[in-house]
């Protein structure tokens, strides 16, 4: 928690991008100073287990970005996928009041083990054939996005960072 608080207080740091997940992050909650986060807004990006951090940002009134981590995308062997690279550029470096999330033309479920035998080995990419699949409802939606890794939610329920019912109302 002290590292996170120092990063928020440090005026020379403009973004905090998670290296990878952090399934024990919920344990630092008693030591988080939400006023420090609120009064020192920064770009915060990560995904999966960093859902706890995103809920911290939400409680402090900050927008956070559920997106790539250093090890899993920025540090991708050979290159970061174009879709991810373009999304990061568009979301973080262009002034825009809103944006549309378009379907990627390619995807991967491949995992390349980080070891010396795989230097210069890229994930195998697959061509997307269908675009988005709507699982519930229909058409285009808009609104505030509130979510994260569903496996992490049970760790947050009942804590001070869990959004109340009104905050979930109308959320995507």
Role assignments for model-derived ranges:
Residues 32-57, 63-71:
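Short, acidic/small-residue loops that bind anionic groups at enzyme active sites
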Residues 145-172:
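Oxyanion-binding "anion nests"
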Residues 65-151:
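Conserved anion/nucleotide-ligand pocket segment
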Residues 25, 53-54, 154:
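Short, well-ordered alpha-helical microsegments
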Residues 17, 45, 171-172:
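Structural motif
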